[in-house]
């Protein structure tokens, strides 16, 4: 993963950036533990059909078997977010980041939770942390700029 993150930090090529992001996501989702992978895959399937409560249960099963599986926490956070459970979602975002500090997906998820609750400064902190990992993501740059405008913060 370190090589992917180093390349992600350095690239300005949009195609390479998206390829690297996808490779990182694939690496985050791999555990080499069949039962864990099965629960995770079933959770992803449940999310595809908007059965977020089932997804939460399945991701929890994966976490019970593999407590260090950051991506299971991240997807459970996403499921909670989609159900409007912001406290539970933010709790899982924090665990995800504790397990994988470079988890730009969890950081951006944290920003969404913060925005939904009106915590613009916290949202900006999450987005800026994601940009430290992936500084050339144009969408995140725009989000950060808008949040800075909302908070009156200058980009230094």
Question: Where do the protein language model's features map onto the residues?
Answer:
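Helix-start (N-cap) detector for alpha-helical repeat units in TPR-like alpha-solenoids
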Residues: 36, 70-71, 104-105, 138-139
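Canonical positions in the second alpha-helix
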Residues: 61-62, 95-96, 129-130
